[in-house]
Amino acid sequence: MNNKGYVMSLASFFLILPAFLLLMVLVDLSTNEAQTQEANLNSHEVLGVATDLETNLPFIGREVIRDKSLEVVNSGIPLSNSRKEVKEEFQNRMDKYCSKYADKGVFVECIILKVDNSYDPFCVEVKSKITVEKGTLKHNVNLTQNISLTNGSFPIYDPLPFVKCRGHGGATINEERISYGSSLANYLQSRGIKNYEAYENATSPLSIKKCPYDPYILHGNTNELVNLKNCIDNGFYHESNDGACFLCRLEGKGICSHYGMETFIIPAPTISPCMNNSSTAPSSVDHVIFNDTGHGTYSGHPILYFSSENHYFSLYLDNSHRQKYGVPIF
C-alpha cells in the first residue's frame, strides 16, 4: 500500500472513532437508565410493601386481641400471660401475612417486639420492626403503634366477668349485655360479701366502649340524671386508676397496677322504690365487685337514676365514685 493509501485508512479510522465512542456512550447511558428505572421501581415496591404492613398491623393486632378475648369469654379460663400470648399469636399471623410477598421476589419480615399497655387504657401498644428487601435495596423501620379496643368493624368483649363467674353458674351473653343470672350473687356470697342478693339477675356491658361524657362529673349534673342513664344504657367504660387494664382482664384480674378502666354493674330493676337511703350493697363498679383481694369490695348507697311505671332502676355508689361521676354525696 502506498503512502496515499495509509493516509486514507488513517483518515477513515479517525472519522469512524467518534461515531464508535458516541455509540459506546449511548449504550452506557441506556444501561444506566434501565438500571435507574429498575432501582426506582424496586424502591417504590419496597416502600409500598412497608407501608402496607404499617397500615395492616393494627387491623391484624385487633383481630388477635378480639380472638383472645373470645377465647376467654367462651371458656371462662384466663390467660396465664396475656402479653406473651397475644404477642406470640400476633407474630404467627404476621409471619403468614409476610409470606405472601415471597412469590413477588420480595423478602418481608415483621418482628413483634413487644405487646403492652398504652398510655390510653382503651388501646394496647405494640412495638414492631419491619424489614423489606428486594435486590440490593433494603428498608428497615421500627414502629410503635396503638391498637384501639373501641374503634373498628367488630367489638371487643370484656372477658373479666366470664372468668370471675365461672364455677358460680356462669355469665351469659344477651344481645349487647352480659347477664349474670344468679352467678354474680353466688360469686359474692362465696366471698362472704354482705347483701350479695342485690346482684341477683344483674347485667353489665359486653363490649368495650369509651364513655363520651368527659369530664365524668357530667354524668350527674343533669336533670333526672339523664347522662348517667344514657351511659348505663349504652354500656360505656371509663378511665380508672383502680380498674384493671384490658390485658390484665384477660388474665382474670379485677384490679392491677396499670392505668385501667371501669364500668357499672347494674342491679335488676325493682317493682318499688324500696331501697331507703340507709340500705347498702356492694358498690356497682366492676373493680369494686371483682376485687377479691382483701377488703377490696366495699359498700355503696343506692341512687335511683330512672323509673318507668312499676320498675325502678338504681345503682349503689360509694362517695368516692359519687364524686367522680358528679352524683350527690351521701
Spans of model-derived segments:
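Long, compositionally biased, intrinsically disordered regions
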Residues: L23-F330
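Alpha-helical hydrophobic helix detector
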Residues: F13-V25
